[in-house]
Amino acid sequence: TEITCHAMGAVWIFDNKDMTIIDIGGQDTKIICVEQGFVKDFMMNDKCSAGTGRFLEIMANTLSMRPNEMCELAREGSGVTISSMCTVFAESEVISLIGQGEKKENIAFAVVDSIVRKVAAQANRMSEDRSMLCLTGGLCECSYISEALTKELGMEVKTDPQSRYAGAI
């Protein structure tokens, strides 16, 4: 299955058989607990795009920038939040913030922060007993997301240049 592929890929990439994998893909987010190299449990957000690469892409398009630009710009922002977890409503909030003259970096921060909070909440529901956290999927290439997840979860979230491809290994 897709879950097993992501787990085996992460075990190979990180050379660790006990971990919690946070996979943020384009269409879904998966939290996969691996013990002794095998999937113990998993949770998947596949009902909506909130907390996924698609969410980031839609919000970046609303700000007329690329997703990777938004991730980097988010480092410079602060002080703004997006309260809605629904992509459609969050986009309305972003448009409203633009209309209010809010700085792009603060809006970018709010978008990335909403992804981080949603994913961290999923990870905390899944497992509090973690020996290692790693980030896979396309959004692992946004170093600010792994840094923000590290801060939010209180434990280092590791990435690797090959993390994006964990499900394909």
Predicted segments, located by residue:
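Adenine-nucleotide phosphate-binding core of ATP-dependent small-molecule kinases
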Residues: 90-125, 164-165
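Conserved phosphate-binding catalytic cores of ATP/NTP-utilizing and phosphoryl-transfer enzymes
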Residues: 1-22, 37, 120, 124, ...
